[in-house]
């Protein structure tokens, strides 16, 4: 399986410590990217989840970005404005937008009582997030607080059965090298 374009802080061992404090040992972090078949029979049947976390208080999909510089809102809600350290600005697709179909798919497949949410996670230590960005766009250091807020938000709802949720999500996963290769080829043609 391929290596994801991440900074070291997200690595499973480091990230697991962040979840231990909230969940004890009752959580699942998928090791590496996860390819799901969310739209069989269409031109783009698969989607890549950078990181999947399943906790007793929710199923979380993280789209990770190793962008440096300042990240600000754009005039287009599906985009973000990145101002590089050298001052050059460009528009990039928002991780929230990239997660939209993945979140929708998981919500359709899992019991409605299990919360499913996503976030854009910026892992570069050289990133500065504009204060007016949505709260689901966060720096790696903000992850523990974001998770605590999700746990508080979902208090009183049915607890997610972590093992069953993992099994349900992985039913739609393709872990093969061929699957990832075909997905990458389709993704390249989509964004030309």
PLM feature spans:
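Active-site beta-strand-loop-beta-strand hairpin of nuclease catalytic cores
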Residues: 53-78
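Surface-exposed interaction regions that form or flank ligand-binding interfaces
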Residues: 1-47, 56-59, 68, 87-192
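Short glycine/proline- and charge-enriched loop/turn segments
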Residues: 77-87
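Cell-envelope/extracellular polymer assembly enzymes that use nucleotide-activated donors
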Residues: 50
